[in-house]
């Protein structure tokens, strides 16, 4: 039985129809009726069915027919989207392929990104005398790799577009705009766009997307304004792109204009568009509007919730951020990381690590961005034990250990005082960037390895990596820690002469501190006096410390008074000024300062110490007794005080400036009470 019309077949499935039709070709005596095979081709749904048909056409002698070969090839490429290597086997059998066949083959190679095979095929097409059409170039341009070679090839194809008179074709123009924008040449893309593309909204979207990709958000926003002037109605894609730009430049006025446009549309806004509005308003700091839209949404997803959480985090309102975070029905990796990073930015390092522990308990696997935030928290706390565990966790879970994670590990190890481990991470890294080298220079400098830091600085330049202002700060710090005054002067001069980097306040401060420590107080003051910007209290503080160290009482008094002009409530400086006047026996001035301290109720900010024990960082503030073991700690301190008295120890109380020693002692007693007397990773400071 020959089934001429598949639609009238008694079989109730496409597979049955296909099998029946294929069987008919086997039982029929006529072998060269290719139209029969073409009709069967119409019901092929899978590559296996296609290959069965192809095999049968070869057996029955139909395959060599040029018309059938072309139909077979085009069907494989366009309807089934089959593998390109099989398509090529079909292609080479077609005698004198026309432009449609060539285009399908070029499209196939372009899709699989086969190292310029599509372009080579195009050149063969030209050799065969086949003229390209408006479909040829979009296939070629969209298939180019995004590298330097792609741009050169794309420009040559652009010349061919002009040569064959296709420069005014909209599809070709859009392909050129896309190619240039993906290669980062927005000026070239704009040149093509400005010629003829302004009637097509898809062209506008390509341009806005390109500007966003290049972080030229103001240009994206300007294009929307130009769209309105050209009476081109934006699509939802346009609005999504523009809202993304608004969120980057914090343009709340444009955000409101887009919102008004959405509100005026009769169609219901999509979830994606509502999410984009929430995110844009939150990024612009308009949290009231963002929350109002969020609450009015009929449906919300994890992106909706995350936008609100992120908005509050960026505003520094961690309380509300945590409230919304805790209410989230579903949390993804991004929402967890935002909360971890929020606490990190607020200086709540313990809380940041606690959120990470909750993330693990929830079974959520972090990514490299999460790990960078966690490692940074460990670095600030000096939590080596947790930092080591994080490194093991990264290796065990095969989290992407890229250059950013490597940089965070280097920073963490240096801040925990483990210089050797930091250097091992550096040497084990497959890739390094400017920040890697800078982290090494700064880390070595801060760990007292000035010579090694300078050696790395020169190695960095040997690798053709140019230092920046942070790198130079590390080098100057290295000279400071190692007492290399002459080299510091040379580096300070080289900032401008060799790398055109203008020294900032911190660079001047480092020079003042270094010269002061070296006893060159007058030279330090001259640098401070000639600074192109007004010195802050930190720079004056460096001069103050140096003046006290080298008994330059007049300079110390000058520096102290300058600090008090900037920070009238700085209790520590008032205390030091009292010590200066007492040392010079200027009792009248001393009484005046003390009277002022009493009159304005000035208090000095207490010092604090951090100590890591059993994977947890404990903080001790001078005079504070909130720790659970405070009673035991202070009892132990009392015992030590009595023992030192019996040992005839007389403390030096002439300088009562800093109370950090109190916090330091409390932390020290806690370590011994905890049974970890060898703990090293802790620090004492005044805030």
UniProtKB/Swiss-Prot annotation:
The gene coding this protein: PCMP-E51
Originating species: Arabidopsis thaliana
Protein name per the record: Putative pentatricopeptide repeat-containing protein At3g15930
Region annotation (Type E(+) motif) ranges: 615-645
Keywords: Repeat
Biological-process GO terms, alphabetical: RNA modification
Type E motif: region residues: 539-614
Family the entry assigns: Belongs to the PPR family. PCMP-E subfamily.
PROSITE patterns linked: PPR
MF annotations from Gene Ontology: RNA binding
InterPro entries: E_motif, Eplus_motif, Pentatricopeptide_rpt, PPR_At4g14850-like_plant, TPR-like_helical_dom_sf
Residues in PPR repeats: 98-132, 133-168, 169-199, 200-234, 235-269, 270-304, 305-331, 332-366, 367-401, 402-432, 433-467, 468-498, 504-534
SUPFAM superfamilies: TPR-like (SSF48452)
């Amino acid at each position: 039985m020959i089934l001429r019309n598949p639609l009238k077949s008694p079989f109730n499935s496409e597979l049955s129809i296909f099998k029946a039709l294929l069987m008919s070709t086997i039982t029929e005596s006529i072998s060269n009726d290719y139209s029969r095979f073409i009709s069967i081709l119409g019901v092929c749904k899978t590559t296996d069915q296609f290959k069965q048909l192809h095999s049968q056409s070869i057996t029955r002698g139909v395959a060599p027919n040029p018309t059938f070969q072309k139909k077979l090839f085009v069907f494989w490429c366009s309807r089934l989207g089959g593998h390109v290597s099989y398509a090529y086997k079909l292609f080479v059998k077609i005698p004198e392929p026309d432009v449609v066949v060539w285009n399908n083959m070029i499209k196939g190679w372009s899709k699989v990104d086969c190292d310029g095979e599509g372009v080579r095929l195009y050149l063969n097409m030209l050799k065969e005398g086949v003229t390209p059409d408006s479909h040829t170039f979009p296939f070629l341009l969209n298939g180019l790799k995004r590298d330097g070679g792609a741009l050169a090839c794309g420009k040559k194809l652009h010349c061919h577009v002009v040569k064959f008179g296709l420069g005014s074709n909209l599809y070709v123009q859009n392909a050129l705009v896309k190619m240039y924008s993906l290669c980062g040449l927005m000026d070239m893309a704009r040149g093509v766009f400005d010629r003829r593309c302004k009637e097509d909204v898809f062209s506008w979207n390509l341009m806005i997307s390109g500007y966003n990709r290049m972080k030229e958000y103001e240009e994206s926003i300007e294009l929307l304004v130009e769209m309105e002037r050209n009476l081109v109605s934006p699509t939802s894609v346009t609005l999504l792109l523009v809202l993304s730009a608004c969120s980057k430049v914090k343009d709340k006025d444009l955000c409101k204009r887009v919102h008004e446009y959405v509100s005026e549309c009769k169609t219901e806004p999509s979830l994606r568009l509502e999410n984009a509005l929430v995110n844009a308003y939150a990024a612009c700091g308009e949290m009231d509007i963002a929350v109002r839209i969020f609450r009015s949404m009929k449906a919300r997803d994890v992106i909706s919730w995350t936008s609100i959480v992120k908005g509050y985090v960026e505003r520094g309102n961690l309380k509300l951020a945590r409230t919304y975070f805790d209410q989230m029905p579903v949390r993804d990796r991004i929402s967890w990381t935002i909360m971890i990073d929020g606490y990190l930015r607020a200086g709540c390092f313990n809380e940041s690590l606690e959120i990470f522990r909750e993330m693990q308990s929830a079974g959520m696997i972090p990514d490299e961005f999460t790990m960078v935030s966690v490692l940074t928290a460990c670095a600030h706390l000096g939590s080596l034990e947790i930092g080591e565990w994080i490194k093991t966790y990264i290796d065990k879970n095969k989290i992407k250990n890229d250059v950013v994670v490597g940089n965070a590990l280097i920073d963490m190890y240096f801040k925990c005082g483990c210089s050797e481990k930091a250097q091992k991470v550096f040497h084990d890294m497959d890739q390094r960037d400017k920040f890697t080298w800078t982290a090494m220079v700064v880390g070595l400098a801060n760990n007292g390895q000035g010579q090694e830091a300078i050696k790395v600085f020169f190695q960095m330049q040997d690798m053709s990596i140019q230092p920046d202002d942070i790198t130079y700060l590390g080098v100057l710090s290295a000279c400071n820690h190692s007492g290399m005054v002459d080299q510091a002067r040379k580096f300070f001069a080289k900032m401008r002469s060799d790398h055109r980097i203008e020294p900032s306040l911190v660079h001047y401060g480092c020079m003042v501190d270094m010269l002061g420590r070296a006893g060159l107080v007058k030279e330090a003051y001259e640098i401070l006096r000639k600074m192109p910007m007004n010195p802050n209290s930190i720079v004056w503080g460096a001069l103050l410390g140096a003046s006290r160290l080298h008994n330059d009482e007049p300079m110390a008094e000058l520096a102290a008074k300058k600090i008090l002009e900037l920070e009238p409530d700085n209790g520590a400086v008032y205390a030091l000024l009292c010590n200066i006047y007492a040392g010079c026996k200027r009792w009248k001035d001393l009484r005046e300062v003390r009277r002022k301290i009493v009159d304005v109720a000035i208090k000095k900010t207490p010092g604090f110490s951090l100590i890591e024990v059993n994977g947890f960082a404990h903080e001790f503030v001078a005079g504070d007794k909130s720790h659970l073991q405070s009673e035991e700690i202070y009892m132990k301190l009392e015992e030590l005080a009595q023992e030192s008295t019996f040992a005839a120890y007389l403390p030096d109380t002439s300088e009562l400036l800093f109370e950090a020693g109190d916090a330091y002692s409390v932390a020290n007693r806690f370590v011994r009470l905890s049974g970890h007397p060898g703990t090293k990773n802790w620090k004492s400071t005044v805030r």
